[in-house]
Design a protein with these regions (language model features):
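Conserved structural motif at the start of ABC-family nucleotide-binding domains
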Residues: 2-4, 17-19
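Hydrophobic anchor residue at the start of the ABC signature
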Residues: 151-152
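Conserved beta-strand-loop-alpha-helix hinge in the C-terminal portion
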Residues: 215, 219-242
Length: 255
């Protein structure tokens, strides 16, 4: 479904991703883990087409199409979705208006407000968000957990083929995290792929990955199954540094 080969990315002339390789098949869950500043969110933004980043080498294909030639809205229509780590507040734009516009933007047939509200009510019940939020401005005055629920609600409404969840666990306590993960599992289609971007392994207690990738210094330095996340939980990222030969001071790759 998603194929990333030798992806190199720069910001303001400085290379920050150094040859990323990643393969995600239909229906798989992959987790990208790494310490702060390792390039995790950069990768998710590049996949969705953020114009801040310059792709200087490599290939990215989704469903056989060259993603690097597509605008962000074209990637969304193709079936990609990004849940943001820090969802923005949009005063004056109601949740229902925003979601209906997003829904109609990725489909050839437009849906009336009446019929869309019927669908939205069902999705809101799945994610545990009151229908009272429909008329509220998007994310304005929402708690951290409510903002994350609104992101998962977008995922439920848009039904993407690949959902990228960028540190969805950030800022959530254990109870809120479990609630969000339960919502993800409820709205996820069987053939939907998920790319989890996370710093901590605790989210993987609730959403089991098929594969875990460790990103450091802009490179994927280790890959394995779910057991790799358990090793990181027990030993921290020093476990990876020792295995692959990365100096903690300065974090320079020495192998």
């Amino acid at each position: 479904m998603l194929s990333v080969k030798n992806l190199k990315v720069a910001v303001e002339g400085e290379e920050i991703l150094h040859g990323i390789d990643l393969e995600i098949k239909r229906g798989e869950v992959h987790a990208i883990m790494g310490p702060n500043g390792s390039g995790k969110s950069t990768l998710s933004n590049v996949l969705m087409g953020h114009d801040k980043y310059e792709v200087i080498d490599g290939e990215v294909k989704f469903l056989g199409q060259n993603l690097l030639e597509l605008a962000p809205e074209e990637r969304a229509r193709l079936g990609m979705f990004l849940a943001f780590q820090y969802p923005k507040e949009i005063p004056g734009v109601s949740l229902v208006s925003f979601l209906r516009a997003a829904y109609n933007a990725v489909r050839s047939e437009k849906m009336s407000l009446y019929h869309f509200k019927k669908i939205l009510e069902e999705k809101m019940e799945l994610v545990g968000l009151s229908t009272a939020f429909m008329s509220r401005s998007l994310n304005e005055g929402f708690s951290g957990g409510e903002k994350k629920k609104a992101e998962i609600l977008q995922m439920a409404v848009l039904e993407p083929r690949l959902a990228i969840l960028d540190e969805t666990d950030s800022g959530l306590d254990i109870d809120a995290l479990k609630t969000i993960c339960d919502a993800v599992k409820k709205v996820r289609a069987k053939d939907q792929s998920i790319l989890l971007i996370t710093h901590y392994p605790r989210i993987l207690d609730y959403i089991a990955p098929d594969k875990v990738h460790v990103l450091m210094e802009g490179k994927i330095v280790m890959e394995d199954g779910e057991e790799l996340a358990r090793k990181l939980e027990a030993h921290g990222y020093d476990y990876v540094r020792e295995k692959v030969g990365i100096k903690k001071a300065g974090l320079k790759i020495v192998n």
